[in-house]
């Protein structure tokens, strides 16, 4: 039944070591492997998962969603519960790419406006790498928004579901998505940025590439699936760690949003 649902949704899968076995064991016996499905749940594990802004670290990635039309449309298009990505640069400041361009916002404003805020953290990020991420993000402040890149994400988000069918090997899935994104790579600007593109580019500038895939192909949903225990649609260098939620609605609010 789970496999049938995954087939209908184009849900990516991956054979992974069974919990408790040695990680990254290429010679693991088939019985030591389990079929892992892409996970779209972002519900916190409990009250302990809700973090204070003071616990944020420079370089943290904020994945968010709102109740507005644009956010809902992006979530429907990408089959994910998040619609926006931003990077925390320290000093209670966040850099993000929105319709008006790349801007700096205070964390208090982000907390007030967003409905859900999930925080992912790149493991073992050094202070120097975090500074380079900050420098790049601030340098891009005022840069125009990549409207064409976002527009081209619409057909790509639909067509790439073929690449994400269950049991498609990760290497083939990665190559398939890259090939389908050729038009985006040729037509979409690299000088203008949309939200997840900014995050990927900032990390790449700091010589900590999250993936070798073109940043114009990556959506906030793709970043979500780069977390530990999930199945990334594209090949990644390191899994992102879940740091916690800055904000998550009560069950009543979740029911109303649905």
Q: What feature does the model see in each segment?
A:
Residues 1-10:
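Bacterial N-terminal signal peptides
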Residues 10-258:
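Cysteine-nucleophile amide-bond enzymes
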């Amino acid at each position: 039944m789970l496999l049938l649902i995954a087939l209908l949704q184009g849900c990516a899968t991956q054979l992974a070591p069974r919990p408790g076995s040695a990680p990254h064991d290429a010679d693991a016996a088939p019985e030591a492997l389990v079929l892992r499905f892409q996970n779209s749940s972002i519900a916190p594990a409990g009250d302990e998962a809700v973090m204070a802004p003071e616990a944020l670290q420079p370089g943290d990635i904020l994945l968010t969603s709102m109740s507005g039309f644009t956010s809902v449309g992006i979530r429907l298009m990408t089959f994910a519960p998040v619609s926006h990505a931003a990077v925390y640069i320290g000093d209670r400041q966040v850099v993000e790419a929105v319709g008006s361009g790349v801007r700096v916002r205070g964390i208090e404003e982000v907390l007030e406006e967003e409905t859900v805020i999930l925080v992912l953290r790149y493991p073992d990020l050094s202070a120097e790498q975090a500074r380079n991420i900050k420098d790049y993000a601030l340098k891009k402040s005022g840069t125009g928004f990549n409207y064409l890149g976002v527009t081209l994400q619409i057909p790509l988000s639909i067509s790439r579901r073929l690449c994400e069918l269950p049991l498609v090997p990760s290497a083939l899935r990665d190559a398939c998505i890259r090939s389908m994104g050729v038009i985006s790579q040729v037509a979409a600007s690299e000088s203008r940025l949309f939200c997840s593109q900014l995050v990927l580019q900032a990390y790449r500038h700091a010589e900590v590439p999250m993936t070798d895939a073109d940043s114009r192909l990556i959506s906030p949903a793709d970043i979500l699936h780069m977390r530990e225990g999930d199945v990334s649609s594209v090949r990644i260098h390191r899994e992102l760690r879940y740091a916690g939620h800055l904000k998550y609605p009560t069950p009543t609010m979740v029911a109303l949003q649905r």
